[in-house]
Amino acid sequence: MSTIRKPSPPDMYDCIVVGAGHAGCEAAMALARMGHATLLLTGNADRIGHLSCNPAIGGLAKGHMVKEIDALGGMMGLWADEAGIQFRTLNSSKGPAVRATRAQIDRDAYLRVVRRDIFAQPNLRVWQDMAESIIVEEGRAAGVRTAYGQEFRAHHVLLTTGTFLQGRIHVGLSNFPGGRLGDAPATGLSASLRAIGLELGRLKTGTTPRLLRDSIDFSMMEVQPPDDPPRPFSFRGPGVRLPQLPCHVTWTNERTHEAIRAGFDRSPMFTGVIKGTGARYCPSIEDKVARFPEKERHQVFVEPEGLESPECYPNGIPTSLPLEVQKAMIATIPGLENAQIVRPGYAIEYDYADPVQLRSTLETKALRGLWLAGQINGTSGYEEAAAQGLWAALNVSCTLRSMPPFLPGRDTAYMAVLVDDLVTKGTREPYRMFTSRAEHRLLLRENNADARLTETGRALGLVDDTHWQLFSTKRAALHSLLDELENRRITPDAAARDIFSRLGEPAPTKGVSLADILRRPSLTLPDLAPFWEGVTRFADDVREEAETIVKYSGYLARQQELVARSARMEDTVLPEDMDYTVIPGLTREIVEKLGKVRPHTLGQAARISGVTPAALTCLEIQLRKMGQR
């Protein structure tokens, strides 16, 4: 139990954040930094910001969201840079839309830096306790009651409970209550949410056994080195600080699969003990072996847990098989024949709320002042959770200050795609973000997250003066470079022809701009230095973004045209209390779907499964009638 707020805590908080995982930490920091009195309630103050599963942040689409969090003024990118021990750019040989940053994280270092910043943050108080129920007064959330018998009052309550709601851990046919291994679950809150009117379901996720590093033979594995130099997540931080380590790659084999099949009769998944739906895109190793019997091997990434940690994380073999089966399976994998298990792999079942019960702000429709973010909304992943935590916090702040809500469009942020998918379509399985979910992904590159979102973060009060100055300087440099590339012209004289010859390129027959030259597929911005030495004075991130804008200008223009075409529907707001039952031309099925989702805009209505173009026309006609009245 710790209190750090001075003077003494208020009788009324602006917001209580329940849960100190990635959603909760991001939300609590944002609210406090924007000046709101915030209480962070956690069952274990020693594990604030703990990486419960794999020690990594980022990846495809996930790295994009970390950059977006940073661009808005959030914390995950800064924390990951400070604790990262291997940075790699994924899809580096592919187009800029799908390139993504992924970092191995020192688990202990990450926890230390998160706790340091949480406990040092003004306006933020930490209290170790378990939330038992939501206080409801005058039709809205008014606070939280805890297991210690405390009542904390607040204008808003944000639940970021992760896997803790009625959490149950499974190892083989043994199971016991737990929010994660070593932590108690939240047992009372689910009943309170049901009493409020929320429908809860059951999901499942899992993790791998942890292995003793000194018992692993890395010489039998392929080395996966870090990038040199490492590329940090944060636009505004000091960069990567810790020494960088390699990861290693090995594979399962038929002997591994035989050991796994031998344990199917004791698998809680295959025997029906686990009822919750698991993650489609992060299946257990037993699920992979059962579903893909034709595959002779599955990849295993052996990842360090930290610079000084004695443990490694064998990414790719999450399992809930009995411990003796886990041991037999591990012993068949090259390099792991003598590996000792420090902690077993396990599955965890937990309650979640189908997110169609939320407004686009992540406030519940059932109760004003109650907000949900993270795995409670059916998502998987640290990054998805942190993005929702920040999204909810910004909207709580907007509500407190009577400002318009923070609702960027699907063409502006991956986190907007995430939230829109959740509240429009709901989910019956753990939702994971992919670049393929974004229809405008060329506009949503990692390297332009600041250009897309930092002005918004500044307007909302989360981007501080230092961050704003760094962004403004970079933006000015980018505009300067783009102007030079478009306006600086090259005439095909003898000197220019000689440069083109050395580049292996045909010389132009008439004067061209540097931008025209850069659009040639085989040339990059550094190749232009012989024509203009000034290109070398710009920072790498500025040059990279300028090159992307120039080379992909035609594609970017077409994407912007598509966005402009859909803007009318996205800007047409539907009243929250609209009575769909009285609108002529709507089928009963469509009325039910619209009534359940209650879309914020006509564009969101169009994304609801089964809502036809004819139904959208009916909605537009109804809106015109309402306007005439």
Curated annotation (Swiss-Prot):
Transmembrane segments: none annotated. GO terms for cellular component: cytosol. Disulfide bonds: none annotated. NAD(+) binds at residues 278-292. FAD binds at residues 19-24. GO terms for molecular function: flavin adenine dinucleotide binding. It is found in: Cytoplasm. GO terms for biological process: tRNA methylation; tRNA wobble uridine modification. Keywords: Cytoplasm, FAD, Flavoprotein, NAD, tRNA processing. Its cofactor is FAD. Its main location: cytoplasm. Pfam families: GIDA, GIDA_C_1st, SAM_GIDA_C. SUPFAM superfamilies: FAD/NAD(P)-binding domain. SMART domains: GIDA_assoc_3. NAD-binding protein involved in the addition of a carboxymethylaminomethyl (cmnm) group at the wobble position (U34) of certain tRNAs, forming tRNA-cmnm(5)s(2)U34. Belongs to the MnmG family. Homodimer. Heterotetramer of two MnmE and two MnmG subunits. This is tRNA uridine 5-carboxymethylaminomethyl modification enzyme MnmG. It comes from Nitratidesulfovibrio vulgaris (strain ATCC 29579 / DSM 644 / CCUG 34227 / NCIMB 8303 / VKM B-1760 / Hildenborough) (Desulfovibrio vulgaris).
